[in-house]
Regions:
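Helical "lid/coupling" subdomains associated with nucleotide-phosphate turnover
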Residues: 1-7, 21-164
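Conserved catalytic-loop position in the HRD/HxD motif
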Residues: 9-13
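Short acidic, Gly/Ser-rich segments with clustered Asp/Glu that frequently serve as metal-coordination loops
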Residues: 15-17
Length: 164
């Protein structure tokens, strides 16, 4: 019988990021609002602001590199990560798989906005909390070598749809 794969749950909150490793919660001092308020003075962030934030996020995430087993599976129930998956072109469903490549492509779109392109041209939110969430997710997946994140939860349904 093959050994059970390790499970990692990711929650990017406004003030911190909670990482649950096989039932044990670890907190990172990275949150969407905390990061955006601490490092982004402009909206969208200036390139130098993003570079500084990247270094800080990388350093904080690096604390976990020895705690995560090779082949671990990454999960989340965050609506903000679900929204990133939709922006990356993942079909809305109760379980959505978002690849690290799709996260990178979405971050590349954010980089275009940071360098002057209107957010509306890229179809992404122009808020700094979104930029911070995407940054944290990207660095988490990249530096801890996750190929994908599986987002679980209720499928998004439009409320107050006209009846047929």
């Amino acid at each position: 019988m093959a050994p059970a794969l390790s499970t990692v749950f990711l929650h990017i909150g406004s003030e911190d990021t909670q990482v649950t490793l096989d039932g044990t919660i670890q907190r990172l001092t990275l949150g969407s609002q905390l990061t955006s308020l601490a490092y982004f003075r402009h909206q969208p962030p200036a390139p130098a602001e993003m570079e500084t934030a990247i270094m800080v996020v990388e350093d904080e995430i690096a604390r976990l590199r020895h705690d995560i087993a090779p082949g671990a599976r990454l999960y989340s129930e965050d609506n903000d990560i679900r929204a990133i998956a939709r922006l990356a072109g993942v079909a809305e469903n109760e379980e959505m798989s978002l690849s690290v490549e799709a996260v990178e492509r979405t971050f590349d779109r954010l980089a275009l906005v940071i360098n002057g392109r209107p957010a509306s041209f890229e179809g992404i939110p122009d808020g700094n909390d979104f930029a911070a969430t995407l940054l944290i997710l990207r660095e988490f997946m990249h530096h801890l070598q996750f190929n994908e994140i599986v987002i679980k939860g209720a499928k998004f349904e439009m409320l107050n749809q006209p009846s047929r």
